[in-house]
């Protein structure tokens, strides 16, 4: 196996395929990248058995067909360390991989390509293309609500659901829920799968979200695959039942509050400074045309913020974890938000007034 290539052609692909590799691989070969030269193409693959990232790069200079695996971190560090514009030759010599460029020469250990684990073959059940920007928005709108190391393992991920012409993402950690749906202009079979947290983060790294560049998504019963430009990302799915988010959305909210997103965000941020550091609770009092936020902590310090809002109705008091509300307001980045409430013990639903694509539910707190 042999190829010659410019440093820049391989730098980004190396960075992306090294992404799935964890710090300390359980098997030595999982710390390696698979390098495979075929006719005019070099493919690079990294895997941690849960997900796999593959990049294809075209070879214009002389090359010899073959395959091997090489320590990912060291190979990438060498590549990154070589000067910009360098031409690099890579050659397999016995069980060593020789990397040469200018006056630099490296000899790396390898493991046989035949030992490299492949994700099992699988059939996709749903396939469609969509703009990268759409998928990026779907993930960005909901990923902050994913659970982290929850014993309910199915919450440590994101639900991807196809229905009619929409793709929907849902995430919840049991205290809050985020759901976002986008029309992708093609009729889809109803299907839902849970993509693990790490897979969602890797997929997000692949998306540049620029303009209308398209990607292809394939969803099977145990895997999800995304074809993005010269990259193919595959992730195993979480086997479990995701909670029915439709039951979490407040049924018939009786109170509607409309407020400026930025003004509300700043008021909550200031009040949060004097909230209990552990529980982060703030109290909200609603009266006609006004929303009052109060916070206090064990040191008996207090904060009070009053915000003008559009609200007509009976007075009401309710408590929330201020961090959860701020996460939602930071994600919405809109002009005006709508809060839908029922009573002091029911969840609040938060939406952008101008768009119903995303909805957020936050459970109340007893204060």
Swiss-Prot record:
A GO cellular-component term linked to this record: DNA polymerase III complex
Keyword Oxidoreductase attached: no
Main location: cytoplasm
Pfam families named in the record: DNA_pol3_beta, DNA_pol3_beta_2, DNA_pol3_beta_3
InterPro entries in alphabetical order: DNA_clamp_sf (IPR046938), DNA_polIII_beta (IPR001001), DNA_polIII_beta_C (IPR022635), DNA_polIII_beta_cen (IPR022637), DNA_polIII_beta_N (IPR022634)
Disulfide bonds: none
GO biological process per UniProt: DNA strand elongation involved in DNA replication
GO molecular-function terms, A-Z: 3'-5' exonuclease activity; DNA binding; DNA-directed DNA polymerase activity
Keyword Nucleotidyltransferase assigned: yes
Keywords: Cytoplasm, DNA replication, DNA-binding, DNA-directed DNA polymerase, Nucleotidyltransferase, Transferase
Top-level taxon in the UniProt lineage: Bacteria
Localization terms from the record: Cytoplasm
PANTHER family named in the record: BETA SLIDING CLAMP, DNA POLYMERASE III SUBUNIT BETA
Family in the record: Belongs to the beta sliding clamp family.
Cited NCBIfam families: dnan (TIGR00663)
Summary of the function given for this chain in its UniProt record: Confers DNA tethering and processivity to DNA polymerases and other proteins. Acts as a clamp, forming a ring around DNA (a reaction catalyzed by the clamp-loading complex) which diffuses in an ATP-independent manner freely and bidirectionally along dsDNA. Initially characterized for its ability to contact the catalytic subunit of DNA polymerase III (Pol III), a complex, multichain enzyme responsible for most of the replicative synthesis in bacteria; Pol III exhibits 3'-5' exonuclease proofreading activity.
Subunit composition and interactions: Forms a ring-shaped head-to-tail homodimer around DNA which binds and tethers DNA polymerases and other proteins to the DNA. The DNA replisome complex has a single clamp-loading complex (3 tau and 1 each of delta, delta', psi and chi subunits) which binds 3 Pol III cores (1 core on the leading strand and 2 on the lagging strand) each with a beta sliding clamp dimer. Additional proteins in the replisome are other copies of gamma, psi and chi, Ssb, DNA helicase and RNA primase.
Protein name listed in UniProt: Beta sliding clamp
Protein source organism: Proteus mirabilis
Gene assigned in the entry: dnaN
């Amino acid at each position: 196996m042999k190829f010659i290539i410019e440093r820049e052609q391989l730098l980004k692909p190396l960075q992306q395929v090294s992404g799935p590799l964890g710090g300390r691989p359980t098997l030595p070969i999982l710390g390696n990248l698979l390098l495979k030269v075929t006719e005019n193409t070099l493919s690079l693959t990294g895997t941690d058995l849960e997900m796999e990232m593959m990049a294809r790069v075209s070879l214009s200079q002389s090359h010899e067909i073959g395959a091997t695996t090489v320590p990912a971190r060291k190979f990438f560090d060498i590549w990154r360390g070589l000067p910009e514009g360098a031409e690099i030759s890579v050659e397999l010599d016995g069980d060593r991989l020789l990397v040469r460029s200018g006056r630099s020469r490296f000899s790396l250990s390898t493991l046989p390509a035949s030992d490299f684990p492949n994700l099992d073959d699988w059939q996709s059940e749903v396939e469609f293309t969509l703009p990268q920007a759409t998928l990026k928005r779907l993930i960005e709108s909901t990923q902050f609500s994913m659970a982290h190391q929850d014993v309910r393992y199915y919450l440590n991920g994101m639900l991807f659901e196809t229905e009619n012409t929409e793709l929907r993402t849902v995430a919840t950690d049991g205290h809050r829920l985020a759901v976002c749906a986008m029309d992708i202009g093609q009729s889809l079979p109803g299907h839902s799968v849970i993509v693990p947290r790490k897979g969602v983060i890797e997929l997000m790294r692949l998306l540049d979200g620029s303009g209308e560049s398209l990607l292809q998504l394939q969803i099977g019963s145990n895997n999800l695959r995304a074809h993005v430009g010269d990259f193919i990302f595959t992730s195993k799915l979480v086997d479990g039942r995701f909670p029915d988010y439709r039951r979490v959305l407040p049924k018939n909210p009786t109170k509607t509050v409309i407020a400026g997103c930025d003004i509300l965000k700043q008021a909550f941020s200031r009040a949060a400074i004097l909230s209990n550091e552990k529980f982060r609770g703030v109290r909200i009092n609603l009266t006609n045309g006004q929303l009052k936020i109060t916070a206090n902590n064990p040191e008996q310090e207090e904060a009070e913020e009053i915000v003008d809002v559009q609200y007509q109705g009976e007075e009401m008091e309710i408590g929330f974890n201020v961090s959860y509300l701020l996460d939602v307001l930071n994600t919405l980045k809109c002009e005006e938000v709508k809060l839908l409430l029922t009573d002091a013990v029911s969840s609040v639903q938060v939406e952008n007034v101008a768009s119903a694509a995303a909805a957020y539910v936050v459970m109340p707190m007893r204060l």
